[in-house]
């Protein structure tokens, strides 16, 4: 069973992440993790923090000489701004006199609409939004991307699975239906908004610039594809074992994600059954080999992969920290007020795709290991290859 946890606050000393249940023999390094974290900072419309934020990575356990040992893998992502926050966010008790006059320590009593601020204050009994926003911040996704790098390495090395994401909508701009999905991360990452369609990309950039001029924010939709998944990952036996249910849960757990769909998703609900499903056809060659004539289901049927590319989309709402804050109340007085203004992005949809890749990789790694087992990459690859050879219909 693959499990993971993260700890840490946005302006704390570091984020800490641990994943367990992965086999020995995965080749991965801090350089690989650093490259993925750099991808997370990509995208036109990111805020000032992305310009000076550098992720300092330290591998604490689970690897030796760039190869996993089979135990838990732990990663620390240090906060390079910690010296500015070490008194305000000190984990240990601190003399109140040291906090006097520090602007960063001022209570945040005007919760932002759309953010975790107010509900978190109510739930945990805080009179200040600082403890809520520090953990609720999307900064936490850096830890998940770090762990996703390890899972991605396993998928590539043991099963030949590649995970790719791209932006299909920002604001009112959408990629035209039928646009071929990308197969190369390098091509997508070279685009300013990580969009595979150049014409749509230019319109998205213009949309972001217009929102910036209006002191506003934008959401959008990312699509994640996993190429090379064999049939049979996941299960129809129980709801919580269905692969699409597990993927949807982890994607919805990403900050600001408000919806998930597989394949043609909600469009399928508006079609008749005769044009909603993927017909099955034989392939030429030895053995009984088949394929789907289309991929409307997104590579998942009955909670299991079909062997076609896995295709899942996640919808991200506009960022709730605005330069022109919305109406709220001051919880200290109960009076009407405007929400607190925090440094933020205009649009973080391109980065959301990178985070979504990480979560898809972690879920697929867990599903593959449940199916094929193995305490080492070599063993699980051998089991995987044996499974493919034994399929009655491939």
Swiss-Prot record:
GO terms for biological process: amino acid biosynthetic process; aromatic amino acid family biosynthetic process; chorismate biosynthetic process. One of its GO terms (cellular component) is cytosol. It holds the Pfam family Chorismate_synt. Its cofactor is FMNH2. Keywords: Amino-acid biosynthesis, Aromatic amino acid biosynthesis, FAD, Flavoprotein, FMN, Lyase, NADP. It catalyses: 5-O-(1-carboxyvinyl)-3-phosphoshikimate = chorismate + phosphate. Its EC number is 4.2.3.5. FMN binds at residues 135-137, 255-256, 302, 317-321, 343. NCBIfam families: aroC (TIGR00033), PRK05382.1 (NF003793). PANTHER family: CHORISMATE SYNTHASE (PTHR21085:SF0). This reaction introduces a second double bond into the aromatic ring system. Belongs to the chorismate synthase family. Homotetramer. HAMAP family: Chorismate_synth. This is Chorismate synthase.
């Amino acid at each position: 069973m693959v499990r993971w946890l993260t700890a840490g606050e946005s302006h704390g000393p570091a984020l800490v992440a641990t994943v367990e249940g992965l086999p020995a023999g995965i080749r991965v390094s801090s350089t690989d993790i650093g490259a993925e974290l750099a991808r997370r900072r990509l995208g036109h419309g990111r805020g000032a923090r992305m310009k000076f934020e550098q992720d300092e990575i330290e591998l604490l356990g689970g690897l030796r000489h760039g190869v996993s040992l089979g135990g838990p893998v732990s990663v620390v992502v240090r906060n390079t701004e910690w010296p500015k926050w070490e008194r305000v966010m000190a984990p240990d008790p601190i003399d109140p006199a040291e906090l006097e006059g520090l602007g960063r320590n001022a209570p945040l009593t005007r919760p932002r609409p759309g953010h975790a601020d107010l509900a978190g204050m109510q739930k945990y009994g805080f009179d200040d939004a600082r403890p809520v926003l520090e953990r609720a911040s999307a900064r936490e996704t850096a830890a998940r991307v770090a762990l996703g790098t390890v899972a991605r390495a396993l998928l590539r090395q043991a099963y030949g699975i590649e995970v790719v994401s791209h932006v299909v909508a920002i604001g009112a701009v959408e990629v035209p239906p039928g646009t071929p999905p990308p197969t190369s991360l390098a091509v997508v990452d070279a685009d300013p908004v990580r969009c595979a369609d150049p014409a749509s990309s230019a319109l998205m950039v213009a949309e972001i610039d217009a929102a910036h001029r209006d002191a506003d924010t934008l959401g959008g939709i990312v699509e994640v594809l996993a190429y090379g998944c064999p049939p049979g990952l996941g299960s129809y036996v129980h709801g919580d074992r269905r692969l699409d249910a597990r993927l949807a849960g982890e994607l919805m757990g990403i900050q600001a994600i408000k919806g998930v769909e597989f394949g043609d998703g909600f469009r399928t609900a508006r079609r008749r059954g005769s044009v909603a499903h993927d017909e099955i056809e034989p392939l030429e060659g030895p053995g009984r080999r088949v394929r789907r004539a289309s991929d409307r289901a997104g590579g998942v049927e009955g909670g299991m992969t079909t062997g076609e590319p896995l295709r899942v989309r996640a919808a991200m709402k506009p960022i709730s920290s605005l330069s022109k804050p919305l109406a709220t109340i001051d919880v200290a007085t109960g009076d009407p007020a405007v929400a607190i203004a925090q440094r933020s992005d205009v649009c973080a949809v391109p980065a959301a795709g990178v985070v979504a890749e990480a979560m898809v990789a972690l879920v697929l790694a867990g599903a593959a290991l449940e199916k094929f087992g193995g305490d080492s990459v070599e063993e699980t690859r051998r089991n995987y290859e044996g499974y493919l050879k034994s399929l009655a219909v491939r």
